[in-house]
Amino acid sequence: MQPKIRVRGQYIKDLSFENPNAPKVFLMMSKTPPEINISVNVSSAALPVKPPEGEQASVALYEVALQINIESVVEKLPAFICEIKYCGVFSIEEDEELEQEQVKRALLINAPSILFPFVREVIAKVTSSAGFPPLMLEVIDFSAMYEKQLAENADGEK
């Protein structure tokens, strides 16, 4: 049984862009393409839900955070540094048959997959506004990321 997940809201929680070596770096980029390093992290946290008086909560709320850090370097000189934490509030209908692992997968795979196109657009606009070509991130396989993290955790427990 798949959890019923709904987006209740989404927002930029934190955004930082540094362009420390402009305009020098623009001249350097015309000769040398930048090296771009990207790190991605996904986390989730339960949010308190107050059901109407006399009723039990049948919906659980979670905040899912998609953190992307990007560093662009040209000839060992930082071109730009971009850090964004893009969040969404998601609801999951509680069901007795729903296993915790299914909820975890929905929050760490499905939810960031929903958020990703929006954060990708923000990054493209910010890099463009800073004078760089718009950075279009490749699609991220959140399922593979999740499975890799599970495998690393299992190896760490041995």
UniProtKB/Swiss-Prot annotation:
GO molecular function, one term: unfolded protein binding
Coiled coil spans: none
Major localisation: cytoplasm
This protein's record includes keyword Transport: yes
InterPro entries the UniProt entry points to: SecB, SecB-like_sf
Gene Ontology CC terms: cytoplasm
The keyword Signal is annotated on this UniProt entry: no
Subunit organization: Homotetramer, a dimer of dimers. One homotetramer interacts with 1 SecA dimer.
Protein name: Protein-export protein SecB
